[in-house]
Protein backbone atom coordinates (compact mmCIF):
# COMPACT_ATOMS: atom_id res chain seq x y z
CA UNK A 1 0.00 0.00 0.00
CA UNK A 2 1.43 3.40 -0.98
CA UNK A 3 1.55 6.40 1.34
CA UNK A 4 -0.69 8.26 -1.09
CA UNK A 5 -3.37 5.58 -0.65
CA UNK A 6 -2.92 5.52 3.13
CA UNK A 7 -3.34 9.29 3.44
CA UNK A 8 -6.65 9.13 1.57
CA UNK A 9 -8.06 6.22 3.60
CA UNK A 10 -11.11 7.29 5.61
CA UNK A 11 -12.69 6.24 8.88
CA UNK A 12 -15.06 7.48 11.55
CA UNK A 13 -13.41 9.34 14.44
CA UNK A 14 -15.41 10.66 17.40
CA UNK A 15 -12.66 12.52 19.23
CA UNK A 16 -9.00 13.51 19.07
CA UNK A 17 -7.63 14.19 22.53
CA UNK A 18 -4.31 15.92 23.11
CA UNK A 19 -1.91 15.91 26.07
CA UNK A 20 -2.90 12.50 27.44
CA UNK A 21 -0.48 10.87 29.90
CA UNK A 22 -2.53 7.78 30.79
CA UNK A 23 -2.69 5.94 27.48
CA UNK A 24 0.87 4.90 26.74
CA UNK A 25 4.34 6.27 27.49
CA UNK A 26 4.94 10.01 27.53
CA UNK A 27 2.62 12.74 26.27
CA UNK A 28 0.22 11.41 23.66
CA UNK A 29 -2.53 12.36 21.25
CA UNK A 30 -5.37 9.85 21.19
CA UNK A 31 -7.52 9.26 18.13
CA UNK A 32 -10.81 7.66 19.19
CA UNK A 33 -12.32 5.50 16.43
CA UNK A 34 -15.99 4.53 16.35
CA UNK A 35 -17.32 1.01 16.60
CA UNK A 36 -17.05 -1.83 19.12
CA UNK A 37 -18.38 -5.40 19.24
CA UNK A 38 -18.62 -5.37 23.04
CA UNK A 39 -21.40 -3.75 25.04
CA UNK A 40 -19.75 -3.38 28.43
CA UNK A 41 -22.36 -2.46 31.02
CA UNK A 42 -20.01 0.13 32.57
CA UNK A 43 -18.73 1.66 29.30
CA UNK A 44 -17.85 5.33 29.77
CA UNK A 45 -17.87 6.04 26.03
CA UNK A 46 -21.28 4.82 24.79
CA UNK A 47 -20.85 7.06 21.74
CA UNK A 48 -17.99 4.79 20.69
CA UNK A 49 -20.04 1.62 20.27
CA UNK A 50 -22.00 2.15 17.05
CA UNK A 51 -19.85 2.25 13.88
CA UNK A 52 -21.64 5.22 12.27
CA UNK A 53 -22.12 8.82 13.49
CA UNK A 54 -24.86 9.50 16.04
CA UNK A 55 -26.80 12.54 17.19
CA UNK A 56 -26.49 13.55 20.83
CA UNK A 57 -29.42 15.51 22.29
CA UNK A 58 -28.54 17.97 25.05
CA UNK A 59 -31.88 19.46 26.06
CA UNK A 60 -30.16 21.75 28.54
CA UNK A 61 -28.96 23.70 25.51
CA UNK A 62 -32.10 23.43 23.37
CA UNK A 63 -33.81 26.82 23.28
CA UNK A 64 -37.21 25.19 22.83
CA UNK A 65 -39.30 24.04 19.89
CA UNK A 66 -41.74 26.90 20.51
CA UNK A 67 -38.95 29.31 19.53
CA UNK A 68 -36.84 27.26 17.09
CA UNK A 69 -37.43 24.36 14.73
CA UNK A 70 -34.35 24.45 12.49
CA UNK A 71 -33.39 20.87 13.37
CA UNK A 72 -36.87 19.51 12.60
CA UNK A 73 -36.95 21.33 9.27
CA UNK A 74 -33.47 20.05 8.35
CA UNK A 75 -34.12 16.35 9.01
CA UNK A 76 -35.05 14.61 5.71
CA UNK A 77 -36.50 11.56 7.51
CA UNK A 78 -38.83 13.19 10.02
CA UNK A 79 -36.83 11.67 12.86
CA UNK A 80 -36.59 14.91 14.86
CA UNK A 81 -39.78 16.03 16.58
CA UNK A 82 -41.06 18.14 19.46
CA UNK A 83 -41.64 16.32 22.74
CA UNK A 84 -43.52 19.05 24.56
CA UNK A 85 -41.21 22.04 24.41
CA UNK A 86 -37.94 20.20 23.69
CA UNK A 87 -36.46 18.16 20.86
CA UNK A 88 -36.58 14.37 20.71
CA UNK A 89 -35.40 11.85 18.12
CA UNK A 90 -36.92 8.70 16.68
CA UNK A 91 -33.62 6.82 16.75
CA UNK A 92 -34.83 3.98 14.56
CA UNK A 93 -35.28 6.43 11.66
CA UNK A 94 -31.76 7.87 11.75
CA UNK A 95 -29.68 4.82 12.67
CA UNK A 96 -27.85 4.69 9.33
CA UNK A 97 -27.92 8.44 8.59
CA UNK A 98 -24.48 9.90 7.89
CA UNK A 99 -25.71 13.36 6.86
CA UNK A 100 -26.99 14.45 10.29
CA UNK A 101 -28.19 17.79 8.93
CA UNK A 102 -30.23 18.31 12.10
CA UNK A 103 -27.13 18.82 14.26
CA UNK A 104 -25.53 21.14 11.72
CA UNK A 105 -28.71 23.25 11.68
CA UNK A 106 -28.95 23.69 15.47
CA UNK A 107 -27.85 27.23 16.44
CA UNK A 108 -27.63 26.42 20.17
CA UNK A 109 -25.56 23.22 19.93
CA UNK A 110 -28.41 21.32 21.53
CA UNK A 111 -27.76 18.62 18.94
CA UNK A 112 -24.22 17.40 18.41
CA UNK A 113 -22.63 14.71 16.29
CA UNK A 114 -20.62 11.83 17.73
CA UNK A 115 -18.42 10.71 14.86
CA UNK A 116 -16.94 12.33 11.79
CA UNK A 117 -15.60 10.82 8.58
CA UNK A 118 -11.93 11.82 8.33
CA UNK A 119 -8.96 10.91 6.20
CA UNK A 120 -5.71 9.57 7.62
CA UNK A 121 -4.01 12.78 6.50
CA UNK A 122 -6.55 14.93 8.39
CA UNK A 123 -6.02 12.97 11.61
CA UNK A 124 -2.24 12.97 11.26
CA UNK A 125 -2.13 16.74 10.76
CA UNK A 126 -3.67 17.12 14.22
CA UNK A 127 -1.43 14.45 15.75
CA UNK A 128 1.69 15.98 14.22
CA UNK A 129 1.05 19.37 15.86
CA UNK A 130 2.49 18.09 19.14
CA UNK A 131 5.53 16.31 17.72
CA UNK A 132 7.96 18.32 19.93
CA UNK A 133 6.19 17.02 23.05
CA UNK A 134 6.45 13.44 21.81
CA UNK A 135 10.17 13.82 21.17
CA UNK A 136 10.85 15.14 24.68
CA UNK A 137 8.61 12.73 26.57
CA UNK A 138 8.80 9.53 24.55
CA UNK A 139 5.13 9.94 23.63
CA UNK A 140 3.26 9.72 20.36
CA UNK A 141 -0.10 8.68 18.92
CA UNK A 142 -2.49 6.22 20.57
CA UNK A 143 -5.42 4.67 18.74
CA UNK A 144 -8.43 4.01 20.93
CA UNK A 145 -12.16 3.56 20.63
CA UNK A 146 -14.48 1.80 20.72
CA UNK A 147 -12.33 -0.94 19.33
CA UNK A 148 -9.98 0.75 16.83
CA UNK A 149 -9.31 -2.46 14.92
CA UNK A 150 -12.99 -2.74 14.02
CA UNK A 151 -12.00 -0.17 11.36
CA UNK A 152 -9.02 -2.32 10.40
CA UNK A 153 -8.07 -0.68 7.11
CA UNK A 154 -8.25 2.81 8.62
CA UNK A 155 -6.36 1.87 11.80
CA UNK A 156 -3.55 0.18 9.89
CA UNK A 157 -3.22 3.15 7.54
CA UNK A 158 -2.97 5.51 10.54
CA UNK A 159 -0.26 3.38 12.14
CA UNK A 160 1.74 3.15 8.92
CA UNK A 161 1.50 6.89 8.32
CA UNK A 162 2.54 7.66 11.90
CA UNK A 163 5.60 5.47 11.43
CA UNK A 164 6.38 7.23 8.15
CA UNK A 165 6.31 10.54 10.07
CA UNK A 166 8.56 9.14 12.85
CA UNK A 167 5.78 9.27 15.44
CA UNK A 168 5.70 6.49 18.04
CA UNK A 169 2.51 4.47 18.14
CA UNK A 170 0.33 2.70 20.69
CA UNK A 171 -3.13 1.16 20.73
CA UNK A 172 -5.84 0.57 23.31
CA UNK A 173 -7.68 -2.59 22.31
CA UNK A 174 -10.38 -4.71 23.93
CA UNK A 175 -9.05 -7.63 21.88
CA UNK A 176 -12.39 -8.34 20.18
CA UNK A 177 -11.13 -7.89 16.63
CA UNK A 178 -9.84 -9.89 13.69
CA UNK A 179 -6.60 -11.60 14.66
CA UNK A 180 -5.05 -10.94 11.26
CA UNK A 181 -5.57 -7.18 11.70
CA UNK A 182 -4.13 -7.25 15.23
CA UNK A 183 -1.01 -9.13 14.14
CA UNK A 184 -0.49 -6.89 11.11
CA UNK A 185 -0.79 -3.85 13.37
CA UNK A 186 1.91 -5.29 15.60
CA UNK A 187 4.46 -4.47 12.88
CA UNK A 188 3.82 -0.75 13.38
CA UNK A 189 3.13 -0.56 17.13
CA UNK A 190 5.64 0.48 19.77
CA UNK A 191 3.29 -0.26 22.66
CA UNK A 192 0.04 -2.16 23.24
CA UNK A 193 -2.58 -1.60 25.95
CA UNK A 194 -4.74 -4.74 25.97
CA UNK A 195 -7.88 -5.14 28.09
CA UNK A 196 -8.49 -8.44 29.85
CA UNK A 197 -11.65 -7.90 31.83
CA UNK A 198 -12.16 -11.40 33.19
CA UNK A 199 -10.95 -14.96 32.68
CA UNK A 200 -14.48 -16.21 33.43
CA UNK A 201 -16.13 -16.46 30.02
CA UNK A 202 -19.69 -16.72 31.35
CA UNK A 203 -19.30 -13.61 33.50
CA UNK A 204 -17.57 -11.86 30.60
CA UNK A 205 -20.55 -12.55 28.36
CA UNK A 206 -22.99 -11.38 31.03
CA UNK A 207 -21.20 -8.05 31.52
CA UNK A 208 -19.94 -7.30 27.99
CA UNK A 209 -22.34 -9.16 25.70
CA UNK A 210 -19.75 -11.62 24.37
CA UNK A 211 -17.59 -14.47 25.75
CA UNK A 212 -13.84 -13.99 26.12
CA UNK A 213 -12.29 -16.90 24.19
CA UNK A 214 -11.49 -14.86 21.08
CA UNK A 215 -9.94 -12.09 23.20
CA UNK A 216 -7.75 -14.57 25.08
CA UNK A 217 -6.69 -16.18 21.79
CA UNK A 218 -5.77 -12.79 20.34
CA UNK A 219 -3.54 -11.86 23.28
CA UNK A 220 -1.79 -15.24 23.12
CA UNK A 221 -1.20 -14.83 19.38
CA UNK A 222 0.13 -11.28 19.83
CA UNK A 223 2.57 -12.35 22.55
CA UNK A 224 3.79 -15.30 20.48
CA UNK A 225 4.21 -13.25 17.30
CA UNK A 226 5.96 -10.36 19.08
CA UNK A 227 7.74 -11.87 22.12
CA UNK A 228 9.56 -8.64 23.01
CA UNK A 229 6.86 -6.04 22.34
CA UNK A 230 5.84 -4.04 25.44
CA UNK A 231 2.25 -4.95 26.33
CA UNK A 232 0.26 -3.58 29.25
CA UNK A 233 -2.67 -5.82 30.16
CA UNK A 234 -5.35 -3.73 31.85
CA UNK A 235 -8.41 -4.65 33.88
CA UNK A 236 -11.15 -2.16 34.71
CA UNK A 237 -12.24 -3.22 38.20
CA UNK A 238 -16.04 -3.29 38.16
CA UNK A 239 -18.10 -3.92 41.33
CA UNK A 240 -19.82 -7.29 41.30
CA UNK A 241 -17.89 -8.47 38.23
CA UNK A 242 -14.15 -8.79 38.76
CA UNK A 243 -13.43 -7.01 42.05
CA UNK A 244 -12.10 -10.08 43.86
CA UNK A 245 -8.64 -11.55 44.56
CA UNK A 246 -9.73 -14.68 42.67
CA UNK A 247 -10.44 -12.69 39.50
CA UNK A 248 -7.07 -10.91 39.69
CA UNK A 249 -5.25 -14.18 40.42
CA UNK A 250 -6.77 -15.81 37.32
CA UNK A 251 -5.49 -12.99 35.11
CA UNK A 252 -2.07 -13.02 36.81
CA UNK A 253 -1.73 -16.76 36.18
CA UNK A 254 -2.72 -16.30 32.54
CA UNK A 255 -0.13 -13.62 31.76
CA UNK A 256 2.68 -15.09 33.89
CA UNK A 257 4.15 -17.32 31.10
CA UNK A 258 4.45 -14.44 28.63
CA UNK A 259 7.54 -12.88 30.21
CA UNK A 260 8.52 -9.53 31.63
CA UNK A 261 7.50 -7.55 28.54
CA UNK A 262 3.86 -8.14 29.52
CA UNK A 263 2.95 -5.91 32.46
CA UNK A 264 -0.36 -5.44 34.31
CA UNK A 265 -2.49 -2.53 35.48
CA UNK A 266 -5.82 -2.25 37.28
CA UNK A 267 -8.16 0.66 36.57
CA UNK A 268 -10.89 1.80 38.99
CA UNK A 269 -14.53 1.78 37.93
CA UNK A 270 -15.99 5.26 37.46
CA UNK A 271 -19.26 6.84 36.35
CA UNK A 272 -17.92 9.71 34.23
CA UNK A 273 -19.81 8.77 31.06
CA UNK A 274 -23.33 8.59 32.47
CA UNK A 275 -24.49 11.90 30.97
CA UNK A 276 -23.60 10.70 27.48
CA UNK A 277 -26.12 7.88 27.88
CA UNK A 278 -28.79 10.53 28.46
CA UNK A 279 -27.69 12.39 25.31
CA UNK A 280 -28.12 9.15 23.33
CA UNK A 281 -31.47 8.25 24.95
CA UNK A 282 -29.97 5.17 26.55
CA UNK A 283 -30.07 3.76 30.07
CA UNK A 284 -26.87 3.35 32.07
CA UNK A 285 -27.02 -0.33 32.99
CA UNK A 286 -24.84 -0.09 36.10
CA UNK A 287 -27.45 2.08 37.81
CA UNK A 288 -26.05 3.80 40.90
CA UNK A 289 -23.33 1.21 41.59
CA UNK A 290 -20.13 2.71 42.99
CA UNK A 291 -16.67 1.34 43.77
CA UNK A 292 -15.64 0.77 47.38
CA UNK A 293 -12.37 2.74 47.47
CA UNK A 294 -11.00 0.93 50.52
CA UNK A 295 -11.67 -2.48 48.98
CA UNK A 296 -10.09 -1.31 45.72
CA UNK A 297 -6.91 -0.20 47.51
CA UNK A 298 -6.69 -3.61 49.19
CA UNK A 299 -7.08 -5.25 45.77
CA UNK A 300 -4.30 -3.04 44.39
CA UNK A 301 -1.97 -4.22 47.15
CA UNK A 302 -2.96 -7.82 46.48
CA UNK A 303 -2.26 -7.45 42.75
CA UNK A 304 1.10 -5.87 43.48
CA UNK A 305 2.01 -8.86 45.61
CA UNK A 306 0.86 -11.66 43.29
CA UNK A 307 2.26 -10.06 40.13
CA UNK A 308 5.74 -9.73 41.64
CA UNK A 309 6.90 -6.46 40.12
CA UNK A 310 4.87 -6.65 36.91
CA UNK A 311 2.04 -4.57 38.35
CA UNK A 312 1.77 -0.91 37.34
CA UNK A 313 0.14 1.52 39.75
CA UNK A 314 -2.11 3.84 37.66
CA UNK A 315 -0.77 7.39 37.29
Where on the chain are the PLM-derived regions?
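Iron-sulfur cluster-binding cysteine motifs and their immediate structural context
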Residues: 41-48, 69-88, 99-116
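Short glycine-enriched, charge-decorated loop/helix-capping segments at active-site entrances
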Residues: 57-59, 205-211, 280-289
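FAD-binding FR-type
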Residues: 93, 116-122
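Pocket-edge positions in alpha/beta enzyme catalytic cores
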Residues: 86, 115, 147, 207, ...
Amino acid sequence: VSRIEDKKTTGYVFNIQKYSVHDGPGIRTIAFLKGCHLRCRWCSNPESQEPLPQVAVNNNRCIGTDKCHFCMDACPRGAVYSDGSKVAIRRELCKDCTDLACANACPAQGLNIYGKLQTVDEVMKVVEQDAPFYARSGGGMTLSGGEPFLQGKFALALLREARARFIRTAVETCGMCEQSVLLEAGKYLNYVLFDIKSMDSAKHKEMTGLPNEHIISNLKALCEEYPDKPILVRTPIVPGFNDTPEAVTAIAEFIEPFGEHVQYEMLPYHRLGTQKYEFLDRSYLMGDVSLDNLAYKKLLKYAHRVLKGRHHIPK
